[in-house]
Design a protein with these regions (language model features):
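Charged, amphipathic alpha-helical segments and their flanking helix caps
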Residues: 1-29, 43-136
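Low-complexity, acidic Ser/Thr/Pro/Gly-rich terminal tails and inter-domain linkers that flank the onset
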Residues: 36-44
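Short acidic/glycine-enriched loop/turn segments that link adjacent beta-strands
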Residues: 33-36, 116
Length: 136
C-alpha cells in the first residue's frame, strides 16, 4: 500500500514554517474580526504527476497575506517578502515522503479589500514523491 501525503500534514507543515519564520499567524480558517496582519493557507489543487519510475503528486497552495489597513503598500510588500524568504527552506514532511520541488508560481492577486486591508495571494507548487515503482 502507498502512503500518500495528507492535506492536513501538508497544511501543518506550511503553517509551522510560516509562523516560525515570519512571526505572524497562519490560518486555514480566519476567525471573524481577526486583526491583521496574518496569513491564510488554502490548498487549491492536487494532481498526480508520476514519472516512469516514481509515484508523484503536485499540490498547488495559495497563501493569502492580509496586511493592516493603510494608504501605503509597504506592509503588504514586506509580508510577501517574509513569506518568500520563509518558504525558501524545505518543508518538514513525514519521513517516507520526499519533496522534489517546492517553488513559487507567482503572485496571483494584489488588491485592497473592503476593510481597507491589502490582500495578496502568492501561489506555490509542491511536488512530492512517495517512492519508486517496482516491477515484479
Amino acid at each position: 500500500m502507498l502512503k500518500k501525503l495528507g492535506l492536513v500534514d501538508l497544511h501543518a507543515s506550511i503553517k509551522q514554517k510560516i509562523e516560525d519564520k515570519t512571526g505572524l499567524m497562519a490560518y486555514d480558517h480566519v476567525p471573524e474580526d481577526m486583526p491583521s496582519p496574518f496569513y491564510f493557507i488554502e490548498v487549491v489543487d492536487k494532481r498526480p504527476e508520476d514519472t516512469k519510475v516514481m509515484w508523484c503528486e503536485v499540490f498547488t497552495v495559495w497563501i493569502h497575506a492580509i496586511a493592516e489597513a493603510g494608504k501605503s503598500k509597504i506592509a503588504i510588500y514586506d509580508m510577501i517578502e517574509k513569506l518568500e524568504e520563509a518558504l525558501t527552506e524545505e518543508l518538514v514532511l513525514p519521513e517516507e515522503i520526499d519533496i522534489l520541488r517546492q517553488s513559487e508560481v507567482g503572485m496571483q492577486s494584489l488588491q485592497e479589500d473592503e476593510t481597507g486591508e491589502m490582500h495578496a495571494i502568492v501561489a506555490y507548487e509542491i511536488k512530492v514523491s512517495y517512492g519508486f515503482k517496482v516491477k515484479i
